[in-house]
Every structure is written in structure tokens, then in C-alpha cells.
Amino acid sequence: MKIVDINERLAISGQPNTDEFINFARRGYRSIINLRPDGEEPNQPGNDAEQAAARRAGLAYNFVPVIGTSITEADIQAFQRAIATTEGSVLVHCKSGTRALMLYALSEVIDGRMKRDEVEALGHAHGFDLGRAVTWLKRQAIQTPRVSGFFDPRTGSIQYVVTDQTTKRCAIIDPVLDFDEKSGATATTNADAILAHVEQQGLTVEWILDTHPHADHFSAAQYLKQRTGAPTAIGTHVTKVQRLWREIYNLPTLSTNGSQWDHLFADGDVFNVGSIKGRVMFSPGHTLASVTYVIGDTAFVHDTIFMPDSGTARADFPGGSARALWSSIQAILSLPDETRLFTGHDYQPSGRHPRWESTVGEQKKANLHLAGVDETTFVALREARDKTLPMPKLILHALQVNVLGGQLPEPEANGRRYLKFPLNALEGAAW
């Protein structure tokens, strides 16, 4: 196995045997980054075996599985983090070394340390063909809009800033207000990171959009509205969710006309992010109110379709329906195959890095709940799986905030805000 030194900290290689890891440590490497998805070849060691070998050799280890034809910015960010968090020399491997050098080149271009027209020469200098990296950069240059994802590890949620590069106007989608259920503390760490990005990029926020009332985190829509002045919006069927949860929470004074948001979108409504056209697709199933935002060549599909290796979202919340979810997913998959899909959650199966971008074509081909599956099979699979899933730990905390558009309950006489829990309201939920 040939090791190619790229710089003083980074080397790349093809697939090593696990018994070589101890020699890597002796040669001064401090970390191994494995870029190969499990199952690429029958005889590859795989993530578990490599992690164990790294531990025995005293090496740090990161699993960042990528496919050369579907690398996303989330993959590049994970590659950068894996290198940045390691002191000393790093050995990155895939099958041949090409993906490793491709990720390095893309990282350098995105961060401005390398020009796009220098990528091919970098590959030739080290004996690799980086044609795919050149193609990736050309494709990225014409994609509209520009999408930046912000992953919240506490809830597995992804928040988005969707930008029209021409006008520097943007929309924020599904922002998270931090909440610690053990202490009852709230914070704005996630939202402030989004605001910092907006400021750094010189953007004007045009919309603050929620895809549905979330059951696993508080919405930061109201906080961001206060900070930016941008209007908030959600799908018009949120009123059905408000009526449903008004009864569950016994909140007779809760207004259920959606007035907590500045705008309610109906199915088919259109809007703009700068000069880019957007439209709204009603996408029920996960909740009664779920919508998909189609903006330029992207669709923000919330809790309908997860990444292909994760499948689809649950449909057993009050008002949910696996059959309705199937119909919503089929409408999303009727978009052009090259449409970029951005999911609402990622739970990092097999310990991989967070990912959130795919395409319609990739989902049709590889989603483990959808590829080669008909409606009857999907509904049976989804309903059976949902019976085994415990409720999200924040569902009763989050929904009483999110049916108010992200507004916290009003302070009581002592100046404190309180949440209210119904007992035994979610009958049949798994523990």
C-alpha cells in the first residue's frame, strides 16, 4: 500500500490492512480517517474493524464515509473537522486515495487557499485524476440557491440558510432554540451561529420559515424575528395542529387561527428569496401541517425523507399517517432527479458524520424504505417500525412552544415561565 504525503500534516492512501495500523503509529501518524462506506467491497475491513485496530494502536479514528459521485458540503465539513481536531499527522484513506485527495482539494478551494483551475494540476502532481472534483466545483458554481446547513447535535436537527447570491437575500428554515430539559434552561447558541453567518456573508433575511410544528426542538423563529425583523411563516394547516394540541394541553385560550405567524402558506403558494422563486408543497404524514419548500433547484423536505441510509420519518404523532406520508414522499420524488433535497434530521447511522443533502435520483435508487417498495409495503413497514419507537424526549415540551410559533409561555406572577405536561395523553407510546 502506497502512502502519498500531501503536506506536513496530511497523507493519503488506498485501503490498508488493519494489522498495518500499529506501524502507522510507529511512523508518527496520530489519526486515521476512513472514507469508505461499509460494504463497498466484500473483503474490506469495515468501520468496526478499523476503529478497533486504531484503538489498539493508540490512534484517533474518524469515520467519514463518502461516495465519490455524491460528495456534499456536509462531507467536506466533516473531513475538515476530523483533521482540525487531531494534533499531529493524519492518514486519510479510501479505496485508492482519490476520494481523499478530492476532499482535500475541495476543502482548499472552498476555503480560498486554492484556485479552481489548480485542482487538476494537484491531482497530476500526486498521480491522481481529480476530474470529479473539477466537475463538482463546476456544478456547485451554477447551483441556485446557495444552501448552508447548521447541524444541532443535541437534537439531530438541521437548520438552513438559503441564499440568493445575486441579491444577498436569504431565508432561514427550521431554526432551533436551545433547550435543556434537565435544567429547564433555554439558550440561543444555534440561532446566534446562524446570525453570525448572516452577518459574515452580508445577507438580509427575507423569511423565517418553519416546515411544521416540531416535536423534538423549540423553534427559534420568534427570536430570529426580533433580531432581524424578517416575517415568520408556516403552512396554513398549522391551525389543525393547534386545535389538536389545544385539547391535549387543555389550553382553552390558545388562538388556533395561525395568527402567531406573519404568513400562512397554502399548497401551491409562491414566494421569493431574493430573485429566486419558491413554492410550497403540502406534505402531510409526519404531521397534519407539514410543508416542503421548493426553492430554485432545491427542496427542503423536513421530516418526510431522511438520508438514503436512514429511510423516512415516523408518522405516529397525533394527526400523523403513514399512508399520507407515502403520498407526500411520492410528490417529492416526482421532482426532477437532479433536485437537491435537504432533510430535517440526521441520526448518523453506524456512527457516520452528519449528512443532510441528497438528490431525488439518489433517494429513488438507494433509500432503504423507498427503493423498490410499493405503498402497501411502505405503510406496513412504517407502521410496524413506529410501534417500536419511543416518543421524542422533548415532544411535550416542544409542541406547546411551537404551536405558538416559537413563543415561550407568558411569565406568571412571579416572573417565571412554565411548561405544562399532560399525563397519559399519548396512549400506546413505546417506552
Curated annotation (Swiss-Prot):
Its cofactor is Zn(2+). Induction: Repressed by BigR. Zn(2+) binds at residues 212, 214, 286. Its EC number is 3.-.-.-. The keyword Protein biosynthesis does not apply. SMART domains: Lactamase_B (SM00849). Pfam families: BLH_phosphatase, Lactamase_B. Keywords: Hydrolase, Metal-binding, Zinc. Transmembrane segments: none annotated. It is an enzyme of class 3 (hydrolase). One of its GO terms (molecular function) is hydrolase activity. Could play a role in cell adherence or biofilm development. Belongs to the metallo-beta-lactamase superfamily. This is Beta-lactamase hydrolase-like protein. It comes from Xylella fastidiosa (strain Temecula1 / ATCC 700964). The gene is blh.
